A protein has these predicted regions:
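Extracytoplasmic/lumenal domain signature
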Residues: 1-7, 12-20, 24-69, 74-177
């Protein structure tokens, strides 16, 4: 026997607050919560972002297809990131629970359950995104091997990372205009 709303994703604790999610199917309800770690007092509950009517990545259909946690939640500054499987993580204001951003990926494009972040950048499915706006022109730093095999930080953009994924490895990393 299982609940209609099992705990999903990994719990994250920051500044004495526990953030967690429950629910699988948007039609049954998805719940993202923030509670005091010491008392369990509910600080906020977002139960609306799981029922967003939106275009689907296949065949031009629309459906209720909001946020469902499918990976460990991540706190970066005043943002809570909720990995959602195939899509880019949903972003919430961690102080209020206000839904800020979510977008389904087109078929065969990347999303992921594994998400990590630092500063104003988060990495999801091997791609780095600016936390304010997911923009292919966003400037980012990525760590990669140089021609002599040494790990180095490279200034680039999200779009160039995506472009380079399509190139044969023999061409190396193309970072110019």
């Amino acid at each position: 026997v299982i609940s209609r709303w099992p705990a999903r994703g990994g719990v994250v604790i920051s500044d004495g607050v526990v953030y967690w999610a429950a629910g699988i199917w948007q039609s049954e309800g998805i719940f993202i919560r923030a509670q005091r770690a010491d008392t369990g007092k509910l600080l906020w509950l977002n139960d609306k972002s799981g029922g967003i009517e939106m275009a689907q990545p296949h065949g031009g259909a629309t459906a209720k297809s909001g946020v469902t946690a499918q990976g460990h939640l991540v706190v970066i500054g005043n943002r809570l990131l909720v990995p959602t499987g195939r899509a880019v993580p949903a972003v919430f204001d961690r102080g209020t629970g206000q839904f800020l951003y979510y977008r389904l990926q087109q078929n065969t494009h990347r999303g992921a359950t594994a998400t990590m972040g630092h500063g104003d950048v988060f990495i999801n499915g091997g791609l780095a995104y600016d936390l304010g706006v997911v923009d292919p022109r966003a400037s980012i730093k990525v760590r990669m091997k140089s021609e002599n095999g040494v790990n180095v930080w490279v200034d680039t953009t999200v779009g160039r990372i995506i472009f380079n994924e399509a190139l044969p490895p023999v061409l190396g990393f193309r970072n110019g205009e």
